[in-house]
Amino acid sequence: MGGFRELVVWQRAKALAVKIYTITRHGRFDTDFGLKDQIRRAAVSVPSNIAEGDERGTNKDAVRFFYIAKGSLAELQTQLEIAHEIGYFDEGILLDLEQECKKIGRMLGSLIKARSAVH
């Protein structure tokens, strides 16, 4: 394998984390450090767990970390919905972020399936 940096799902998840940092740098997030921190942590957790999983010695270990990444992605989606509902950003931003989260989730599902099938 060529390493985690070659995984498209890692690349997309990292790009999403960078986008989240940019979005949460301004506006209402300036005064809500709690939610901003939670959103950022969840966003960074996704590519971090993909990377850690890919570098593990066994597929079983890798899959465990990929599931953790999926969990962090669901956490991120929930927090983004809350941020939108309390007026931190508009629906267009939410839809864009949700679409990317769904793509990453599908890619993680495929990666889990592929790595689970390898013995």
Cite the ranges covered by each PLM segment:
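Short, C-terminally biased terminal segments at protein or domain edges
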Residues: 1-119
